[in-house]
Amino acid sequence: RSGNPTRNAFEECMTSLEDGIKGYGFSSGVAAISACVELLEPDDHVIAMDDLYGGTVRLFNEVKTKSQGITVSYVDMTNFENVENALTDKTKMIFVETPTNPLLKIADLEQIANFAKANSILSVCDNTFASSYIQKPLNFGIDIVLHSATKFLGGHSDLIAGVLVIGKDDRELIDKM
């Protein structure tokens, strides 16, 4: 569907909670992640946190690397030198989850956002475990924040939904999404 009043209200609410520009609702958190990865081209490289939700790892390793031709380097982002060392001329996205699932690792979002901007790389943060109540990645300069609404946003695991919010007024990014 191109529009739905309930989904529109959800997107507007999440955009407001995250201090963003534009939000998009999805049928699941993995669907939101998949939509972010669709912004990439074949042979693009992603630097990803080494401790991610298993569904994200499977999406990267079993689906997107095969169907889309991207490559992924998993690094421990608690040591920022690992991010710097993983950079290649094909790196187009940094994908961070903080705190991570399941080990609760914490990455410096402002440092990641600044590095991404300095290298013209899209920064994406899975904020599922923190929620916008505790942490607002867009306020640290992250380009896109996403959530699996099934977990803490829903509160009871009685719904399946996902959302992503764009944090900068980037018409090209909004149009692509």
What feature does the model see in each segment?
Residues 1-16:
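A glycine-/small-polar-enriched, mobile loop at the entrance of the PLP active site in fold-type I
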Residues 23-177:
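Conserved PLP-enzyme active-site core in the AAT-like
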